[in-house]
Regions:
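NAD(P)H-binding glycine-rich loop region in Rossmannoid oxidoreductase-like domains
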Residues: 1-50
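NAD(P)-dependent short-chain dehydrogenase/reductase
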Residues: 117-123, 127-161, 165
Length: 174
């Protein structure tokens, strides 16, 4: 098991690999207290830096590095779709603290990724992965609905980005 902060024997597997995929990061499905916030940011930034160092030290580095990121980085808006050309968030006047924090995490995560010196990098800005597995976000949302706590959130016009677990898996299967 990798701690996400140190290089170990796993770095040997990078040497000569075609692709490296880093999906490391503490779950955001938790209370946003100080300890969890610190773990959310550290687990993403530190693991990204360590993977970048391992790639930089490889005698035969991979051609591509796929790095997890998040759609949370985009501004909350109704007027346009968010894609790689979209407006980044964090400057919205009415954004709650938890939104700002999530955007700050995303920016720090991507900055650590951009600082890496590797050939080709791809930031996988993905959203919640919905699966029937116990303990996932779908399980959490269904638990709320079963208790009568589901329904429209806010004004009901906002979008919730998500990806089906099988589609998420297939993007790596080749």
């Amino acid at each position: 098991v990798w701690d996400g902060a140190t290089r170990g024997n796993w770095t040997r597997e990078i040497d000569g690999s075609d692709v490296v995929i880093n999906l490391a990061g503490r779950s955001v499905n938790c209370r946003y207290n100080a300890a969890n916030r610190r773990q959310m940011i550290d687990s993403r930034v530190q693991s990204t830096r360590v993977v970048g160092q391992a790639i930089a030290n490889a005698s035969r580095p991979p051609r591509v590095w796929l790095q997890a990121s998040t759609t949370t980085i985009y501004a909350h808006r109704y007027d346009a779709a968010n894609d790689e050309t979209g407006v980044l968030g964090g400057n919205e006047v009415d954004a709650p603290d938890t939104w700002r924090f999530s955007i700050d995490v995303a920016r720090a995560w991507e900055q650590a990724f951009e600082e890496a010196t590797t050939a080709r990098t791809v930031a996988l800005r993905s959203a919640m992965t919905m699966s029937p597995d116990a303990g996932g976000i779908f399980d959490t949302l269904m638990s709320l609905v079963r208790r009568g706590l589901g329904g429209r959130a806010g004004d009901g016009r906002q979008f919730i980005s998500w990806i089906h677990h099988e589609i998420s898996y297939r993007r790596f299967a080749g």
